[in-house]
Amino acid sequence: MRRFRPLFLWLVIAFLALLYVVNSLYSALLEGLHLPLQTNDQVILESSRLAPLTTIVLLVLAVIVAPLCEEIFFRGFVFPGLRRGLATGWAIVVSALVFGLAHADLGSLPVLIVIGLLLALLRWWSGSIYPGLLLHILNNGISAAVILLYMVGRLH
């Protein structure tokens, strides 16, 4: 595993900013084209008041189990496998596309691809799935926190 460098923290911050920009632009495009694509988070939000306990269990799975399984599969197996036959840059891009498409969430596809790019870059740079796993848990945890705040009436 490589030693942590502050520059890398800035790269992560830049990617998170890019994530926000991509999400905003994609949302504006969908709205402008009047395409009624929902994200998985929106579906969970809509059902959260009807089945709160189910939603809480789903959120725990989304924050802990999903990132662990996805990082082991996509960055532990898919990415290294792609690197055997492709240049590293292409392996990063292809693994990010597969990661995005595997979520079956057209409403969030560009954002998921950017997340996949960041996580594959983290895997390549660090030589480990652990930094990406932590970032993945953080990302899903933020989404879960927003949904929980919505459920308790703090967000509308």
Each predicted region: which residue ranges?
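Hydrophobic, lipid-facing residues on alpha-helical transmembrane segments of integral membrane proteins
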Residues: 9-25, 29, 64, 68, ...
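Short helix-coil transition sites and intra-membrane helix breaks within transmembrane domains
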Residues: 66-71, 105-109
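Functionally important transmembrane alpha-helices
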Residues: 89-156
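Membrane-interface helix/loop boundary segments of multi-pass membrane proteins
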Residues: 69-94, 124-128
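Membrane-embedded glycan transfer/ligation machinery
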Residues: 23, 62, 75-79, 95, ...
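Juxtamembrane helix-loop-helix connectors linking adjacent transmembrane helices
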Residues: 1-66, 84, 153-156
